[in-house]
């Protein structure tokens, strides 16, 4: 009888170990596969819905450091600390830029960040790192693409970013761009961003 009880106890312990232990980790944060620096900018933060939502998605992952330029520096481009930002660049293998397309360009603060942080970057200084652009745009097919008003794709708008990445020796990753962006589709945008950051 004692042996039978011991066997039952051992079986229950084994069952609990195999089937219940993983449940205790079910709510742990997902993790980015590569140590990642995310630079976020929006020219009108108080109106930001999509950019804010994408920032929150990035912040949900371990291994990701998020820096919102307007939160850190306001709108004063002279306050950007190039030394501190370069240190952050050196500590991460991938840099992600999240912003709304602003007059077919990046935001003013993001351009100032690049000027201050990369202003003295010579060819190949960020060798081995990756650049990933994430952007939203109000315009859709009537604006972008071969039949659109400007005749180029939204991804083409970011060619200066691609040139900067390649000049610095970085790998240019395919951008994640959302045309005709809508707050109704924010959960989908967040999911897509998280999946890309986990790669």
Locations of regions flagged by a protein language model:
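A short beta-strand-loop structural module common to alpha/beta enzyme folds
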Residues: 61-78
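Bacterial N-terminal signal peptides
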Residues: 11-22
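Glycine-rich phosphate/pyrophosphate-binding loop and the adjoining helix
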Residues: 30-37, 55-61, 160-199
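Bacterial N-terminal signal peptides that target proteins for export
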Residues: 2-11
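Structural motif
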Residues: 74-83, 184-189
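Boundary at the C-terminal end of the N-terminal hydrophobic targeting segment
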Residues: 26-28
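Helix-loop-strand module that forms the ligand-binding subsite of alpha/beta enzymes
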Residues: 81-162
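Short beta-strand segments enriched in small/hydrophobic residues
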Residues: 35-42, 134-135
